[in-house]
UniProtKB/Swiss-Prot annotation:
Family note: Belongs to the UPF0340 family.
Organism encoding this protein: Streptococcus pneumoniae (strain Taiwan19F-14)
Pfam family, one: DUF436
Lineage summary: Bacteria, Bacillati, Bacillota, Bacilli, Lactobacillales
Source organism, top-level taxon: Bacteria
InterPro entries given in the database record: Antibiotic_NAT-like (IPR028345), DUF436 (IPR006340)
Stated name of the protein: UPF0340 protein SPT_0687
Length: 187
């Protein structure tokens, strides 16, 4: 698999998702990543530290330039805990948990986050404003209600299926209620 192509596809997808979700500075963005799926393998079976680092470093650069915080979801072997900067955990009142990821418990994305973040910690849950799922890792539990599916410009990064989610406030009220225009769907 060509690393330049993976980096280019990652950049394209993330920039497209950010444009479609209209995220503001200070927002939380969750990443679910299966490097095995990117390489054409089965999730959890062919993890690649190099691919994890390539993708996470690329995404951190894009989000960091916009003031958006990254949370990297781990696999079920760490109960889908997430790596965030300690400052983010404190700012959002997130409970820090004790686990250090490995390639096969947490995954390559979490290891990369521990490498590239300034002061990484693991937290059990978040309510992100949006997120990107590379390889069908199931990020929905970490995106706040109401989740809105986003169709990325590319359907795959490498060989991994790609989906994205945004969120919007709940529409409450009855027949007389009026709602502001939805910045995500714009209709």
């Amino acid at each position: 698999m060509n690393e330049t192509q993976i980096q280019r596809e990652t950049r394209q997808v993330v920039e497209d998702v950010l444009e479609k979700t209209n995220l503001k500075q200070g927002a939380l963005f969750v990443l679910g990543l299966s490097s095995s799926e990117v390489l054409g393998g089965q999730i959890g079976k062919e993890s690649s530290q190099e691919i994890g680092e390539l993708i996470v470093e690329t995404i951190l650069g894009i989000l960091g330039s916009r003031g958006i915080h990254l949370a990297v979801q781990g696999c079920e072997h760490v109960n889908r805990a997430l790596v965030v900067e300690r400052q983010v955990a404190e700012q959002f009142g997130l409970e820090i948990v004790s686990v250090h990821p490995t390639l096969h418990a947490g995954g390559s994305g979490q290891l990369a986050a521990f490498k590239f973040m300034q002061d990484p910690v693991e937290v059990e849950f978040i309510k992100a404003h949006a997120g990107l799922d590379i390889g069908d890792t199931a990020i929905g539990m970490h995106v706040k209600h109401v989740q809105v599916p986003i169709r990325p410009i590319l359907r795959e990064i490498g060989h991994a299926h790609v989906t994205a989610l945004a969120s919007r406030p709940k529409l409450i009220g009855g027949a007389r209620a009026h709602y502001p225009q939805d910045a995500i769907r714009k209709s």
